[in-house]
């Protein structure tokens, strides 16, 4: 099998800086094969972009699993698209498990448009107060993360989270925020 593989350093214009990602434009649809390639690449993510009926589809793999969304590998894929696939375009659109993603090229700048994560009120305020050892003003739940909003940035600076309790809650992560 012959594949054209690119490695791109996202978020930088300097070689060996930024966040590296593997990029493969191919019609591979075999999930097991994509996982094996990502494992061998051993980068935080490898993006696989296929074209079906004039639309691009993107999937991302860490060395160990497929992920639903990856910003830097999407930017890396757009860079390859603009520079090696179709240099006449200034927008790269790809469908993913997280929805439609767009990268817009304006001169040497790239703008990434990700789907909005819908936030809903999180009902168990007491639990989040225990997690942060501080009472938040509001708590919202996104697709994978809990967002706790506090009164001011000094509260954020002095938070003493209960990391053991965090690990017991089935979410990807916690975000503490305040107006600064």
List the model feature ranges, each with a label:
Residues 1-69, 73-180:
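Active-site proximal loop and beta-alpha junction motif in alpha/beta enzyme cores
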